[in-house]
Amino acid sequence: MLVLGIESSCDETGLALYDTERGLLAHALHSQIAMHREYGGVVPELASRDHIRRALPLLEEVLAASGARRDDIDAIAFTQGPGLAGALLVGASIANALAFAWDKPTIGIHHLEGHLLSPLLVAEPPPFPFVALLVSGGHTQLMRVSDVGVYETLGETLDDAAGEAFDKTAKLLGLGYPGGPEVSRLAEAGTPGAVVLPRPMLHSVDLDFSFSGLKTAVLTQMKKLEAAHAGGAVLERAKADLARGFVDAAVDVLVAKSLAALKATRLKRLVVAGGVGANRQLRAALSAAAQKRGFDVHYPDLALCTDNGAMIALAGALRLARWPSQASRDYAFTVKPRWDLASLAR
């Protein structure tokens, strides 16, 4: 089965072709980072318009790279939610228009399910069941993943997502957009232990997260730094130390909660998905913990940590292989800007 995947939930336009027998044949991605940088964040209207411009050229790119023809495609999967309403509507409209014109069925995919399953795209995918740490700009969750469509929420953030905390910390430090990679790069120049920040809920009995207090602690420290240093190299070094303190605190919490989830479920496999999963400090800490504690940790390829069409094509193919009745030829669709992943549990 050959599935075309279309991702347009936020500021990346992604298309891909996934074959259930041959794997990922091709994927193409356009990021809108440069366009949104001058605004310091994603502008929804601009994002939607750019998806319209980019989708069909990316489709041609994917078809050319894979050697596939439109007649070879068996179904079209698209991100139905969650995400920006306008951006979702663009992707859904294009998917259904193509499906109608080509006489193909469609299937709407939960964006986070795509992230959860994205580590299955590697050469040696982890077998079910596993614990998944889903960590991105909008979500931070720990899930038990028993099979496709069989998900149990173990813990989640009570306020800010980890990626959101990274982005807001970057703004407090006067860094550019996107903030997450910028604050991580600055942290690498900081001195370990020079600034020690709180680890919210590190020792709580549950598996939930909270990052708003950590963000507030960064704000407090930043005000002190600006009052003590008018500027110059001293302030820049202090900001690097503060960035290091923030990243160390966030990573400590993510690692500790992941270990607790593995212990609670008695599983030995951890999958890390979402944009923050590309963070080098987080990967290093989890790999060290895995070696020490004797569990396996799996990540998507770095190129597939961000939003992408490959994960949507994969999720669509896996769902249609298990539940062919989920394919639709109605070509009437809704999008779900807010959509609880737990609602997919079977």
UniProtKB/Swiss-Prot annotation:
Alphabetized CDD domains for the sequence: ASKHA_NBD_TsaD_bac
UniProt KW Lipid biosynthesis keyword: no
Protein's cellular compartments: Cytoplasm
The protein's Enzyme Commission number: 2.3.1.234
Xref: InterPro entries: ATPase_NBD, Gcp-like_dom, KAE1/TsaD, TsaD
One Pfam family, short name: TsaD
First-tier enzyme category under EC: transferase
Cofactor note: Binds 1 Fe(2+) ion per subunit.
Residues the record lists as binding substrate: L134, V135, S136, G137, G138, D167, G180, N279
GO annotation, cellular component aspect: cytoplasm
Single GO biological process annotation from the record: tRNA threonylcarbamoyladenosine modification
Residues reported in the UniProt entry to bind Fe cation: H111, H115, D307
Domain of life of the organism encoding this protein: Bacteria
UniProt GO molecular function: iron ion binding; N(6)-L-threonylcarbamoyladenine synthase activity
Cofactor(s) needed by this chain: Fe(2+)
Catalytic activity, reaction form: L-threonylcarbamoyladenylate + adenosine(37) in tRNA = N(6)-L-threonylcarbamoyladenosine(37) in tRNA + AMP + H(+)
Key words, A-Z: Acyltransferase, Cytoplasm, Iron, Metal-binding, Transferase, tRNA processing
UniProt record similarity statement: Belongs to the KAE1 / TsaD family.
Free-text function comment from the UniProt entry: Required for the formation of a threonylcarbamoyl group on adenosine at position 37 (t(6)A37) in tRNAs that read codons beginning with adenine. Is involved in the transfer of the threonylcarbamoyl moiety of threonylcarbamoyl-AMP (TC-AMP) to the N6 group of A37, together with TsaE and TsaB. TsaD likely plays a direct catalytic role in this reaction.
Annotated NCBIfam families: gcp_kae1, T6A_TsaD_YgjD
PANTHER family, sorted: TRNA N6-ADENOSINE THREONYLCARBAMOYLTRANSFERASE, TRNA N6-ADENOSINE THREONYLCARBAMOYLTRANSFERASE, MITOCHONDRIAL
Name under which the protein is recorded: tRNA N6-adenosine threonylcarbamoyltransferase
